[in-house]
């Protein structure tokens, strides 16, 4: 898919992989909405690349819905979603202070897995609302898994589980969306 002129949403866009992705999409001519909990840092990058920064908590249905609407209002419905929002706090199952707090594990799952699904469902709805391009495509969704999903290390139980969930979610999502012209795939950096 040629991204030039198409609306793109990147989560976790204030830093790291998300920032690099937003930059690359803008360089190819995409209209980029940079979603991040840290709207200030996303704003600095958005100014630099000609995009728009939108504060977004990917774990919140309401926040994500508002962010996708703001992106749609600015650039039109998304044809591209790249989900890079994620956290990776290293934490042993049982450390010096005792068992890992369940909330630590739950929070990683909320951000990395549920947050990815939250944006996937909203972007997919935007893509399906549009007519296909001449190529038959309606859009592309790229989820960020990690090599940790397949080869996690000590202290990565929550992170590996969350990224394994992203990898496992992507195949059925790809199968479901393919007939409608939306490609869904996952990358696994590391």
Language model features with spans:
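Alpha-helical segment proximal to the catalytic Tyr-Lys
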Residues: 125, 175-176
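Canonical Rossmann dinucleotide-binding motif of NAD(H)/NADP(H)-dependent dehydrogenases/reductases
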Residues: 2-32
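Catalytic Tyr-X3-Lys loop
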Residues: 87, 98-118, 142, 166
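Conserved mid-core segment of classical short-chain dehydrogenase/reductases
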Residues: 88-106, 129-135, 155-158
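Active-site helix of classical SDR
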Residues: 120, 162, 170
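The beta1-alpha1 cofactor-binding region of Rossmann-like NAD(H)/NADP(H)-dependent oxidoreductases
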Residues: 39-40, 55-67, 102
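Residue(s) in the substrate-gating loop at a strand-loop-helix junction
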Residues: 146
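Conserved glycine-rich Rossmann-like NAD(P)H-binding loop of the short-chain dehydrogenase/reductase
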Residues: 28-44
């Amino acid at each position: 898919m040629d991204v030039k002129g198409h609306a793109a949403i990147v989560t976790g866009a204030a830093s790291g992989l998300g920032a690099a992705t937003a930059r690359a999409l803008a360089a190819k001519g995409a209209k980029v909405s940079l979603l991040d909990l840290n709207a200030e840092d996303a704003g600095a990058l958005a100014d630099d690349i000609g995009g728009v920064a939108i504060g977004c908590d990917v774990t919140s249905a309401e926040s994500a819905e508002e962010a996708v609407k703001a992106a749609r209002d600015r650039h039109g419905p998304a044809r591209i979603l790249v989900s890079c929002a994620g956290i990776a706090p290293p934490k042993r199952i049982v450390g010096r202070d005792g068992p890992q707090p369940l909330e630590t594990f739950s929070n990683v799952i909320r951000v990395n897995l549920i947050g990815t699904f939250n944006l996937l469902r909203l972007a997919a709805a935007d893509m399906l609302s549009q007519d296909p391009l001449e190529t038959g495509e309606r859009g592309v969704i790229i989820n960020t898994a990690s090599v940790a999903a397949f080869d996690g290390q000590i202290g990565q139980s929550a992170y590996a589980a969350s990224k394994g969930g992203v990898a496992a979610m992507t195949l059925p999502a790809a199968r479901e969306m393919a007939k409608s012209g939306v490609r869904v795939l996952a990358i696994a950096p590391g």
